[in-house]
Swiss-Prot record:
Record protein name field: Probable transcriptional regulatory protein OTBS_0251
Family to which this protein belongs: Belongs to the TACO1 family.
GO BP: any one term: regulation of DNA-templated transcription
Native species: Orientia tsutsugamushi (strain Boryong)
PANTHER family in UniProt: PTHR12532:SF11, TRANSLATIONAL ACTIVATOR OF CYTOCHROME C OXIDASE 1
Intracellular or extracellular location(s): Cytoplasm
Length: 249
């Protein structure tokens, strides 16, 4: 029985990983096709170049990238998709901004609203959560010990607002008006980033110190992550390592 149980757990984890990968690939393909509608020359279409870079980093096969670009020429593909932003508040002043790409705004709004409601939060009007964030460019490079300090110096010199260095990614934050120029200049020195987009950064963060609340928040963000229409979400929360680990048990 123990072996059977372990096998079932492995199957469950693999199934969850496969589902997450499928959603990621679908999201990458959708972004490539939408970006390519503005032109397929990546020299002039920086959103498309960013989408392709993200796709390559996440191992989306080359033929699927090419097919996604070709789909942009079909007027029936993604013609009725809308980019929608939702703002939500949970407990303790925690705010989350959700960015979605959808062909059915009623469905997506209902799904996102239901997720917040289930875990003790609610959607709020435009500006009621986003005032806690700054809107800026976000550029992610793979973290490499040999280039991190050089990246930091170069980014600050050409106008970046801030840069965060960690074991997985080096994240450069830029004013929106300098976003494209900074990508191009850094790319000449360090190669193209693994991901780049206009996003949200919290001005201050709320430290979650209660295990029960942490569990509820983790379930909420996992539910958002599982929703096919949700592209990205940004929150003003952080966990201590102990609380986060306790919340997973």
């Amino acid at each position: 029985m123990a072996g059977h149980s372990k096998f079932k757990n492995i199957q469950h984890r693999k199934g969850a990983q496969d589902k997450k990968k499928a959603k990621l690939f679908a999201s990458l393909i959708r972004e490539i096709s939408l970006s390519a509608k503005s032109g397929t020359d990546i020299q002039y279409n920086h959103r498309l170049r960013a989408a392709i870079s993200a796709a390559k980093f996440n191992n989306l096969p080359k033929d699927r990238i090419e097919k996604a670009i070709a789909q942009a020429n079909n007027k029936d593909n993604y013609e009725n998709y809308f980019e929608i932003t939702y703002e939500g508040i949970i407990f303790d002043g925690i705010a989350i901004i959700v960015e979605a790409l959808t062909d059915n705004t009623n469905r997506t709004a209902a799904n996102v609203r239901a997720i917040f409601s289930k875990y003790g939060g609610n959607l709020v009007g435009t500006g009621n959560a986003s005032f806690l964030f700054d809107r800026l460019g976000i550029i992610k490079f793979e973290s490499k010990a040999s280039t991190s300090e050089k990246l930091f110096d170069a980014a600050i010199e050409i106008g970046a607002e801030d840069i965060e260095l960690d074991e997985e990614y080096n994240v450069v934050y830029t004013p929106i008006k300098l976003f494209t120029n900074i990508i191009e200049e850094l790319a000449q020195l360090f190669g193209y980033p693994v991901e780049s987009y206009i996003g949200w950064r919290p001005r201050n963060t709320v430290l979650i110190s209660d295990t029960e609340k942490a569990q509820k928040l983790i379930k909420l963000v996992n539910a958002l992550d599982d929703d096919d229409d949700v592209q990205r979400f940004f929150g003003n929360y952080e966990f201590s390592e102990q609380i986060y680990n306790n919340s997973l048990t």
